[in-house]
Every structure is written in structure tokens, then in C-alpha cells.
Amino acid sequence: MVFTIPEGLHPDLNPLAWMVGTWRGKGRGEYPTIPAFEFASEVVFNHDGRNFLNYFSRSWIIDAEGEIVRPASSEVGFWRVKPNNVLEVLISHSTGITEGWVGTFDGPKIQLVMDQGYSAPSAKIVTAGVRLYGLVAGELFYAYDMAAEGQ
């Protein structure tokens, strides 16, 4: 895998240098309590020279032609690299949920498991989750599975 280390990137983050940038794509979402849906997303990883990546993700529900119907979700967070290829990730959702994730990376392959979660009184309660990220054919691939609302 060939990539450029961004200027000023903290050395701890070199293994995640491939993630830095803006990624756009489309996907499909499913959950037992709602109808399946198609979405478009934009994911941004950037840095300010400190030992964490800033993370921002937003998505939109799209129609069959790929046109935006309405906003869907937003997340912000921070990604930290720890010894032994361990990641610690904090993510807050616009819906009132904040999660702590722990996982590992192996080159451009990342697996995270939800370690702890907080839900605001008006938010759904998320009890578990798994996130996978990877570089596939030059594109950011990700999958997000969650357990919430008793499902």
C-alpha cells in the first residue's frame, strides 16, 4: 500500500495516514425497526499536528436516482493510536449518543468494538456495536452494526 504521510502529521498517526482526507460514497442501511434505505455519505479525517485524528461524518437519505431526499445523520469524534496497533475512538452522534470504541488495525484494515456508550435521556439506547473500516480499491469501505432499541 503506497500513500503519502501528510505534512505535520503526528508520528503516532503514521499508521492511519491513509485515512486522512475527504471520502464520499453511497451505501445501504438496514435495521429491524425501520425500512431499508439508501444513503450518501461524506467522511472526513483531518489532523492539527496533535496525536489524534479529527473525524466528521454526515449522511443523507437518497432516492433511487441518487438524489438527496433529506439529511440522515452526523457524527464527530477523535481517533487515537495506542501501542500494539490498538485504536481508541470517541464518537458523538447528532441524535444524542456518545460512544467509546476500542479496536485494532492491521495496515488499512480496522475493526472497532463499542466499549462504552452514553445516551441522552431523549436518545435511543445503543447497547453494542462493531465498526469495520478498510481501504478497498482506493476507496474507504466501512460497515457499522449496532444493537439498540432491544434489537
Where are these regions (language model features)?
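Amphipathic/hydrophobic helical signal segments and adjacent flexible N-terminal regions
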Residues: 1-52, 60-71, 137, 147-150
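Hydrophobic core residues within well-ordered beta-strands of beta-rich domains
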Residues: 19, 73-75, 129
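Short hydrophobic/aromatic-rich beta-strand segments that constitute the beta-sheet cores
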Residues: 25, 53-57, 87-91, 110-114, ...
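A short, structured loop/turn motif at beta-sheet edges
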Residues: 45-52, 80-85, 103-110, 133-139
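Helix-adjacent hinge/juxtasegments
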Residues: 63-102
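Acidic, glycine-rich flexible loop segments
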Residues: 94-98, 105-130
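Mixed-charge, glycine-accented linear interaction segment located at domain edges/termini
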Residues: 120-151
